[in-house]
A protein has these predicted regions:
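N-terminal secretory signal peptides that target proteins for export/translocation
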Residues: 1-10
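Low-complexity, intrinsically disordered segments with a bias for serine/threonine
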Residues: 8, 30, 231-233
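Bacterial N-terminal signal peptides
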Residues: 13-24
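Short histidine/acidic/glycine/proline-rich micro-motifs that form metal-
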Residues: 42-45, 49, 75-79, 106-108, ...
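Residue-level signal for threonine
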Residues: 53, 80, 194
């Protein structure tokens, strides 16, 4: 083999390696960021099809913006803050870029000590941040019925604003704003929102979530236009 042939072979190998590296970077860049909705029956969309639950409606809003984010619905009916903490390890096996934490409502309905709920929710945030330090956190505020007592209600409602402040997280003041207590917007049980109710919840969440997604979408250099549409529907965590 002549010197010129050897040089030509090395040039070919070099170009091939460059192509593979660039292809790998392109695939990595195209991977959507994940929004984990960790919640109870409100997040799960109790009594409705999954596509009617507010996380799926958020995915549609994202697709309309052509932003590259994937919604994972980890809502579980009847779940408490302790239950969410117990199943968190499995959920963190997949990367989490944004956490929407909607837990605590069932704690309040059961009259559990607010301090216990606070500790559990803080532990969830701590574990997610320990695994994914760059995660963005949104805390969804919740209220309890008046029959739980005024003192209990004040202590319970303070949990969410306090957690958001302590963790420099975004706060959805009351995720059921405009829905809670409405006969027309809840199922016969008076607790779980109808499809129309979930549309309002999605609007409540979107007001807080959209600015965060917008800021992150600007860093997604995909296909040269900064973002890529994700047409896949929201997925349910098993």
């Amino acid at each position: 083999m002549t010197r010129s042939q050897l040089a030509g072979n090395w040039k070919t190998i070099f170009l091939a390696l460059c192509f593979l590296i660039l292809q790998g970077l392109s695939v990595a860049a195209a991977a959507p960021r994940t929004i984990l909705f960790l919640g109870d029956s409100i997040t799960a969309g109790y009594g409705l099809d999954m596509e009617q639950a507010f996380p799926a409606l958020i995915q549609k809003k994202i697709a309309a913006k052509s932003w590259n984010f994937r919604v994972v619905n980890a809502g579980q009916s009847g779940d408490t803050s302790a239950g969410g903490l117990n199943r968190l390890e499995w959920l963190l096996k997949n990367r989490v870029d944004i956490l929407v934490l909607e837990l605590g409502g069932n704690d309040g309905l059961r009259g559990l000590p607010p301090e216990t709920t606070r500790k559990n929710l803080q532990a969830i945030i701590d574990r997610v941040k320990a695994k994914y330090p760059e995660v963005k956190v949104l805390v969804a505020g919740m209220k309890v019925p008046p029959n739980m007592g005024g003192d209990y209600g004040r202590k319970f409602e303070a949990i969410f604003a306090d957690l958001a402040k302590k963790n420099k997280a975004a706060l959805i003041p009351f995720v059921l704003e405009g829905v809670g207590g409405s006969r027309e917007l809840n199922l016969a049980d008076g607790i779980h929102p109808t499809a129309k109710g979930h549309e309002i919840i999605a609007t409540n969440v979107w007001k807080v979530l959209e600015p965060i997604l917008r800021s992150l979408a600007g860093t997604q250099a995909i296909g040269g236009n900064g973002s890529r549409s994700l047409n896949a529907p929201a997925v349910r965590a098993a």
